[in-house]
């Protein structure tokens, strides 16, 4: 493939896709990623996964503070790219940048556009009980995920799949979809199909508060919520701790109880069942497996219950 490609991306998802392109000998002439960020508990700067891969391959790298900076835009022009590929870069790009490459900018979106436009298509699709996801490649315009569709593929969402697991599956197949698109661009056969605006939905970035579990819902819905916010921002609930009032309890893994009848009041702790802690939902029940009490280490849910002298009777 002779196309000169500039790649813009930041997290592990983007690094996985980039590796697929590099393994296929795509001519990456430059890479753009976000500036290094300090660790939460120290001042040490952490490089993005895309930066680490770029450095390991000795590919020219830019980390602009602002993508509108004239010096940065001048450097992009010097790379004389035929096409820009954008994967989870993390910034909405202005038209001046989009106009630089000969054939335009193409974005790999981890969702089936026009549904789930925004930063969290993977998480919100699972939280909504979705059973099918996929990648969409669009030719970018100045809007948020509004460009014409060039290619689509599909990935089934397994009944126990978390957002982290779906992200891995989409990244693995997304690189192949981009390779197909680049081949079509080079051959002059790529198609651009306008999105159906009537079908558009939004998927804004999740907040930590959205990880909160609402037990007054069917167990299937609660389970979808937990899977959708795993690993980030993470699911949580509350319990009453003797002498300490309401405390948060992180829920890191759970599974559905096979019997779907009514067990008790929503959030009621029904006790230990095997290795799990059984919690009633509005319909059915959920088995908590691994939890993390506020200020404590990760532990088995049954050990948390036993360690509280079995005084925890309800989650809320």
UniProtKB/Swiss-Prot annotation:
The keyword Transferase applies. Keywords: Protein biosynthesis, Transferase. Its EC number is 2.1.2.9. (6S)-5,6,7,8-tetrahydrofolate binds at residues 111-114. Coiled coil: none annotated. One of its GO terms (cellular component) is cytosol. HAMAP family: Formyl_trans. Attaches a formyl group to the free amino group of methionyl-tRNA(fMet). The formyl group appears to play a dual role in the initiator identity of N-formylmethionyl-tRNA by promoting its recognition by IF2 and preventing the misappropriation of this tRNA by the elongation apparatus. This is Methionyl-tRNA formyltransferase.
């Amino acid at each position: 493939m002779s196309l000169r490609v500039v790649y813009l991306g930041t997290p592990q998802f983007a690094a996985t896709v980039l590796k697929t392109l590099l393994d296929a000998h795509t001519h990456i002439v430059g890479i753009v990623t976000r500036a290094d960020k300090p660790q939460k508990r120290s001042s040490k700067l952490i490089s993005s996964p895309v930066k680490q891969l770029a450095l390991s391959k000795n590919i020219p790298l830019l980390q602009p503070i602002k993508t509108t900076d004239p010096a940065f835009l001048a450097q992009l022009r010097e790379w004389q790219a035929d096409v820009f590929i954008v994967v989870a870069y993390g910034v909405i790009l202005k038209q001046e940048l989009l106009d630089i490459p000969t054939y335009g900018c193409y974005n790999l979106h981890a969702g089936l556009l026009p549904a789930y436009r925004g930063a969290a298509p993977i998480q919100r699709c699972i939280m909504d009980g979705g059973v099918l996801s996929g990648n969409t490649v669009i030719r970018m315009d100045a809007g948020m995920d509004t460009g014409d569709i060039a290619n689509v593929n599909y990935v089934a969402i397994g009944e126990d799949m978390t957002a982290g697991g779906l992200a891995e599956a989409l990244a693995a197949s997304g690189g192949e979809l981009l390779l197909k698109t680049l081949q079509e661009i080079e051959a002059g056969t790529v198609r651009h199909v306008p999105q159906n605006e009537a079908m558009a939905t939004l998927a804004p970035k999740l907040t930590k508060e959205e990880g909160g579990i609402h037990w007054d819902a069917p167990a299937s819905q609660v389970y979808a919520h937990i899977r959708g916010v795993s690993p980030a921002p993470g699911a949580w609930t509350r319990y009453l701790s003797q002498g300490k009032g309401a405390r948060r309890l992180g829920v890191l893994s759970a599974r559905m109880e096979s019997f779907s009848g009514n067990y008790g009041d929503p959030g009621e702790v029904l006790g230990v069942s095997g290795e799990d802690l059984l919690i009633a939902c509005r319909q059915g029940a959920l088995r908590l497996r691994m939890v993390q009490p506020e200020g404590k280490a990760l532990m088995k849910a049954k050990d948390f219950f036993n360690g509280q002298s079995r005084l925890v009777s309800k989650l809320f």
